[in-house]
Amino acid sequence: MLSSSPASCTSPSPDGENPCKKVHWASGRRRTSSTDSESKSHPDSSKIPRSRRPSRLTVKYDRGQLQRWLEMEQWVDAQVQELFQDQATPSEPEIDLEALMDLSTEEQKTQLEAILGNCPRPTEAFISELLSQLKKLRRLSRPQK
């Protein structure tokens, strides 16, 4: 593991900058793994096979579906902030849309009424609109491989 302490940096860099700052800056930009530090000790790292790191793998979701979920969550957050804006202590409840998707419509309504029970404003319009939006929203499917 690289150390950023001045005692461990003994050789000056050719461009005259402090090598400790370079090491610290480089380690702050990306995470290093054991394969990265091992490949740095070899002069030609291009010939060493690198294993795929799990953080580099990507998963494809349906972008339209993700966009609908994002818009729905933003709408819910905005509505909840509006409902609780008159409250002295800001304690906005969290509404888990995925958990609501698992429930029946009546259970969803009961759950939302319980969550929004201490709201200073009327919540019936918000609850009915959220329930109608949930019917249109599909659960996020498993990622495509």
UniProtKB/Swiss-Prot annotation:
InterPro entries with a match to the protein in the record: CPI-17 (IPR008025), CPI-17_sf (IPR036658)
Pfam families linked: PP1_inhibitor (PF05361)
PTM note: Phosphorylated on several residues.
Start-end of Basic residues biased regions: 21-32
Source domain of life: Eukaryota
Compartment(s): Cytoplasm
Compositionally skewed regions (Basic and acidic residues) per UniProt: 37-47
TM stretches of this protein: none
Molecular function GO terms recorded: protein serine/threonine phosphatase inhibitor activity
Main location: cytoplasm
Region (Disordered): 1-59
Keyword entries, A-Z: Cytoplasm, Phosphoprotein, Protein phosphatase inhibitor
Entry-annotated residues carrying Phosphothreonine: T58
Tissues expressing the protein: Detected in colon, intestine, kidney and brain cortex.
Positions with biased composition (Low complexity): 1-14
Coiled coil regions in record: none
Stated role: Inhibitor of PPP1CA. Has inhibitory activity only when phosphorylated, creating a molecular switch for regulating the phosphorylation status of PPP1CA substrates and smooth muscle contraction.
Family label: Belongs to the PP1 inhibitor family.
Protein name (record): Protein phosphatase 1 regulatory subunit 14D
Native source organism of the sequence: Homo sapiens
Gene that produces this protein: PPP1R14D
